């Protein structure tokens, strides 16, 4: 480990790593010296992120995966465990927005898909990687949330409820693992950020009026390197 590569020798895994906050966070972790496992559905998009990391002198491995498939997550956990002795950083970023609609009009099938990706997949990731996280000298789990998870907003019921449940799940995990002194949980609200999801939610918004994903990625890295407490929810403003 060196000052310019504080995560040298560490292993990180980022979900939703093909674009936006996930891609930016993966690149920031790699720039800090970590070997980053890139997880998302689209292999070609992951390869683009992998190429940028390699061109910058970093290390990355792609793992194309549909996170809505619990068995696939378990297999990924087994594959990573077979190759690496420990996991130092797990970033749970993948999510879907779904339709912004009144509660009474929420489509049950879409809501089920949304809860599967935004909540159940994250529990499955923790289940698959908890043993490997506990083998690290110090491990960090970062979960991306949203202000609507704790501040209800009209038409955001489906997405907001998934994030509210995620915050409870991760807060519970933080409480359950605090005794170890080796595993920290960070619940991160990125705030308004220039992503495809944001553009879909606010189509009339000027993209340059909100911060780029890189700002969020740098804040996440800074938190990982700091003496931050476990279970804390933080909001990242520009």
Please state what every model-predicted region is.
Residues 11, 18-20:
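Conserved glycine-rich cofactor-binding loop
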Residues 32-48:
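Conserved glycine-rich Rossmann-like NAD(P)H-binding loop of the short-chain dehydrogenase/reductase
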Residues 44, 64-75, 108:
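The beta1-alpha1 cofactor-binding region of Rossmann-like NAD(H)/NADP(H)-dependent oxidoreductases
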Residues 74, 97-112, 155:
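Conserved mid-core segment of classical short-chain dehydrogenase/reductases
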Residues 78, 117-137, 175:
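Amphipathic alpha-helical dimer-interface segment in Rossmann-like NAD(P)H-dependent oxidoreductases
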Residues 96, 134-179, 192:
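Catalytic loop of short-chain dehydrogenase/reductase
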Residues 104-123, 142, 166:
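Catalytic Tyr-X3-Lys loop
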Residues 183, 187-188, 195, 203-238:
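C-terminal helical subdomain
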């Amino acid at each position: 480990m060196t000052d310019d590569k504080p995560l040298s020798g560490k292993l990180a895994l980022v979900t939703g790593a093909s674009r936006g906050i996930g891609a930016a966070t993966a690149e920031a972790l790699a720039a800090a010296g970590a070997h980053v496992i890139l997880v998302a559905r689209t292999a070609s998009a992951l390869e683009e992120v992998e190429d940028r990391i390699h061109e910058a002198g970093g290390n990355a491995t792609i793992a194309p995966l549909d996170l809505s498939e619990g068995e696939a997550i378990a297999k990924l956990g087994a594959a990573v465990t077979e190759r690496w002795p420990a996991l130092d950083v797990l970033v749970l970023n993948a999510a879907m927005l779904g339709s912004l609609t009144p509660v009474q009009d929420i489509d049950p099938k879409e809501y089920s898909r949304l809860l599967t990706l935004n909540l159940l997949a994250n529990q499955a990731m923790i289940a698959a990687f908890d043993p490997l996280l506990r083998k690290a000298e110090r491990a960090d789990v970062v979960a991306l949330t949203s202000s609507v998870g704790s501040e209800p907003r009209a038409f955001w019921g489906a997405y907001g409820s998934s994030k509210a449940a995620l915050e409870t799940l991760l807060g519970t995990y933080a409480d359950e693992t605090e005794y170890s002194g080796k595993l920290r949980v960070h619940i991160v609200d990125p705030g308004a950020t220039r992503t495809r999801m944001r553009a879909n939610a606010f189509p009339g918004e000027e993209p340059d009026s909100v911060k780029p994903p890189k700002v969020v990625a740098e804040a996440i890295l800074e938190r990982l390197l700091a003496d931050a407490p476990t279970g804390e929810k933080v909001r990242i403003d520009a």
